[in-house]
Amino acid sequence: MKVFVTGATGAVGRPTILLLVAAGHEVTAVARTDEKRAQVEAAGARGVLVDLFDPGAVAAAVAGHDAVVNLATNIPPITRAARRSAWATNDRLRREASAHLVDAAMAAGAGRLVQESVVFYPDSGDRWIDASSTAPAPTPVVASALEAEAQAARFTDGGRVGVVLRFGMFYGPGLSHTETFLRLARWGLAYSAGERSRYTSSIQVGDAAAAVVAALGAPAGIYDIVDDEPLASDAYADALAAAVGRKRHLR
């Protein structure tokens, strides 16, 4: 299958490219710089420089592909994440770029589109929830993900297969926020996401990449991509502390 991938040098994009190439797919990967293009080409993909906000450029790049995988995001670092303005480019990618990619995929006759999204369900305590039972309740910084999901639904409504992957919080080697959490844990200040009883669902980036590849053969719809054990924030912080062999000084 000829697969067009955006966000190819991101947290999930890097392992996804490797898995797609290993599975025998012919991969075109979008990069933002010549250096990034060299990285994806070293992984076995064909690298291209494309402005995702330029619909004409996107259409030209997508032509001739069987599937589009949209993993493009611009998530700010933890030190800036509290600023709403820091999410502006990410919002544009989800609102504008996702629409351009769907338009281009439909014009190209591609039969399948995979759209990255995020789990954003309301706090439901220890009750098990998923996309089929619980409506999303996104915070302002992730609300634009719903617009990207709507574009995937538009693709499906056009007689094709649109798959949305709602990922949990990524973790893995080399990810900036993972390194930040571990550094805090070494100082005895383990990360805690909100109230101590609030649950967090996570996903290792390698598993997330495997889900992207599997989505190329999945029915249309929304899928939650998370580990099988969500953790309450307090337990999450304890797990981080244990991982670095430290006790938490603050609770």
Per-region residue spans from a language model:
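NAD(P)H-binding glycine-rich loop region in Rossmannoid oxidoreductase-like domains
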Residues: 32-96, 100
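Conserved Rossmann-fold NAD(P)-dependent oxidoreductase catalytic core, especially the SDR/UDP-sugar
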Residues: 82-140
